[in-house]
A protein has these predicted regions:
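Non-catalytic beta/alpha edge segments that cap or flank active sites
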Residues: 1-145
Length: 145
C-alpha cells in the first residue's frame, strides 16, 4: 500500500520533518506580587514573546515562579534568546528577584546563610514552627538552622 509519509519516499525538502527540536527552560522567582498584580506587569512582555516561547506563572503566598519554555530547532539562537528574555524579565523585577533558577525561597535562604556562615533560629510558635518546617525540608539545613 502506498504511504506518502514513508521515510523511503521523503525528499530533501521534507527533511525538516525530522529536524530535532531543542527545548530550553529559564526561570525567574520573584517576591511581592499577587497573581493579578503580576499579570498586569507582565502583560506587555508576554504579548511580545515569539511563538516558540511559552510563559507560565505560578504564584503562592506572594512568591511567583515564572517559567519560560522555548522550543526551536536552532539551538544556539534559542539559548541566546532565552537568556535574553530571562534577563529582560529580571530587569523588570530587579528589586523583587529571589532567584534566576528553579529554587524555592527556603533553598535560596539556605544558600545565602551557608555562604555567609550565618545561622537562623526561631521561637516555637505557630509561625515559628511553620518557618522551621519549611527550612528543615532542605537537605543540609542543619548547617544554618
Amino acid at each position: 500500500m502506498f504511504n506518502p509519509k514513508s521515510p523511503l519516499l521523503m525528499s530533501e525538502n521534507n527533511a525538516s520533518a525530522h529536524t530535532e527540536m531543542n527545548t530550553e527552560i529559564r526561570y525567574l522567582v520573584i517576591y511581592g506580587y499577587t497573581s493579578r498584580e503580576l499579570a498586569k506587569v507582565i502583560k506587555h512582555f508576554k504579548l511580545h514573546l515569539p511563538e516558540y516561547v511559552k510563559m507560565t506563572v505560578r504564584t503562592q503566598s506572594l512568591v511567583s515562579r515564572i517559567t519560560l519554555t522555548g522550543v526551536d530547532n536552532k539551538v544556539e539562537l534559542l539559548r541566546f534568546n532565552m537568556n535574553r528574555f530571562q534577563q529582560m524579565l529580571a530587569d523588570i523585577f530587579s528589586e523583587e528577584v529571589i532567584s534566576m533558577q528553579d529554587k524555592t525561597l527556603p533553598q535560596v535562604l539556605g544558600e545565602l546563610l551557608t555562604e555567609r556562615e550565618l545561622s537562623v533560629s526561631c521561637a516555637e510558635s505557630c509561625t515559628g514552627g511553620n518557618i522551621a518546617h519549611r527550612i528543615v525540608q532542605i537537605p543540609g539545613s542543619s548547617a544554618y538552622f
